[in-house]
Design a protein with these regions (language model features):
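Function-determining surface determinants
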Residues: 2-483
Length: 483
């Protein structure tokens, strides 16, 4: 197995940590399941109560700079200990995070500017202490932490921490139930192997948001909101493998963030964005696969039952929120009896959607999908990339040239589907699939060609107009990349 690659340019001291979300429906039962896993059952555990107050300015200047600042009260035995911690943003968006971390004991729960200036990059963040003067509490977390130390034969040491409690911001609160694996010594591969051992018994979801990020989202009223696409920035001359890593990682982040939200949110848009995220990810893998043949993608078959539930739930949500409502006035026409019948009709897809949402959530409590997603996290980190200090390989075409060929090939596949269109359900389905693959490929390579993408191929558009399968896809079929 290839080793997990960790960038060497991260600030020191740094924290290398894997965050995993756990179901919140039965925390006590879940804790018992964690305790009896074969990895942890015979190891000594330590329980600690933690209360953390996070600080920022009213306009959240620290958050804008990717900085989290907290004071932690730690109660274990004897006198409570207080720690002031500053964390800086590192490899964001992934459950595997590498962040700068500076933590020191303080005499009270008041912030210490002296310690900040002496032991952290505070001079760059706040050279004149104006930010410090404006700092105030913005949210808190308090939870019970159970920790185990796992020492391996390869000399690596990993701290496994189970956190169960809540996040509070003003009058808002949200449950907190997660597992953290922190690498204390050794190679990051240890995190992968230990996490996989636990994932075989416990339903886990990779968690790309830190506690501080969730605290900010809670304060804003946006916790577990739908996460939309945020296309990764790629450049025309960057190596293809680097672009693939950046693009796939962003799409996987969207997918897993919406799965996490789906466990507690009834918002139809969460379901929609989860399915969009998965389609974007699979389409991008199809786009970049020729350049990553040696990477050996995980087997994603374990996700099929879950994604079937998600797809069927999306169909029901569309029926009850988009397809049927416009017909209300035409059907009822002010007739009370017809209005009653119409309401009865609308209740059917709503009830079916409720049942299907429960099925999707039940699927997320099976360990198999989480284990597959966890494999994907580390697979993404193992993707080949060019070291920052290496010159580009002249034998490898840059992204723009490579992308032009790949998107051109997808154009040909779509054109072939349009030419073969017989008006059947199967042929129309094929056209929709090819069109969506092309759309997601163009989105993945956004920013590569000069100027604005959107050049039309008139012949393809004329064929599209003749095919009922492609209504609403104008502008997707004629985009090209490259000269």
């Amino acid at each position: 197995m290839n080793a997990v690659k960790i960038p060497t340019t991260q600030p020191e001291p740094c924290e290398i940590e894997l965050k995993l979300a756990l179901p919140v429906s039965d925390p006590s039962g879940l804790a018992h399941r964690v305790f009896i896993t074969s990895l942890l059952a015979r190891r000594k555990s330590t329980r600690t109560l933690l209360h953390n107050t996070y600080y920022d300015t009213p306009d959240q200047l620290l958050r804008q700079q990717g900085v989290a600042l907290r004071v932690r009260r730690k109660a274990h035995s004897g006198k409570p200990q207080r720690l002031q911690t500053l964390k800086t943003e590192g490899a964001s968006g992934s459950a595997l995070s590498i962040r700068g971390e500076w933590e020191f004991a303080v005499p009270s729960e008041a912030l210490s500017l002296e310690i900040l200036r002496a032991n952290a990059p505070w001079a760059r963040i706040d050279p004149d202490a104006r930010i410090f003067a404006a700092l105030g509490p913005c949210f808190v977390t308090h939870f019970e932490r159970t920790t185990w130390l796992v020492r391996r034969r390869d000399a690596s040491t990993v701290e496994v921490a189970l956190d169960i409690g809540k996040i509070e911001a003003g009058d808002k609160s949200a449950p907190l139930c997660e597992l953290e694996l922190e690498l204390l010594h050794g190679e990051p591969q240890a995190l992968s192997e230990i996490a996989q051992q636990i994932a075989g018994r416990i339903p886990l979801l990779p968690l790309g948001q830190s506690k501080s990020e969730r605290g900010y989202a809670l304060a804003k009223g946006a916790l577990d909101a739908p996460v939309r696409a945020d296309p990764a920035r790629v450049r025309a001359r960057m190596p293809v493998a680097d672009a693939a890593h950046r693009v796939l990682r962003e799409m996987f982040r969207q997918f897993t963030a919406n799965l996490h939200a789906l466990r507690v949110s009834d918002d139809p848009e969460v379901v929609h964005q989860a399915r969009v995220g998965w389609r974007r990810f699979r389409s991008a893998w199809r786009l970049f696969r020729p350049a990553l043949e040696s990477a050996g993608a995980p087997d994603w078959d374990a996700l099929k039952p879950l994604m079937t539930f998600v797809g069927e739930l999306r169909d029901l949500d569309v029926a009850r929120t988009e397809t049927l409502p416009p017909f209300t006035e035409d059907y009822t026409a002010g007739n009370p009896n017809r209005t009653k019948d119409w309401q009865t009709l609308l209740e059917a897809p709503a009830a079916a959607a409720t049942l299907q949402r429960k099925s999707a959530r039940f699927a997320l409590e099976d360990p198999a999908p989480g284990a597959t997603l966890l494999q994907t996290v580390f697979w993404l980190e193992r993707l080949p990339r060019q070291p920052a200090d290496n010159a580009p390989d002249p034998s490898t075409p840059p992204l723009r040239q490579w992308g032009a060929r790949r998107v051109g090939r997808m154009h040909q596949q779509l054109e072939s589907a349009l030419e073969d269109d017989a008006g059947s359900v199967a042929s129309q389905h094929r056209i929709r699939i090819e069109a969506n693959r092309l759309r997601y490929a163009i989105e993945a390579l956004r920013g590569v060609p000069p100027g604005d993408v959107g050049l039309q191929y008139p012949a393809l558009n004329r064929k599209r107009q003749k095919s009922p399968a492609n209504t609403g896809l104008a502008g997707l079929l004629g985009v090209r990349i490259g000269p």
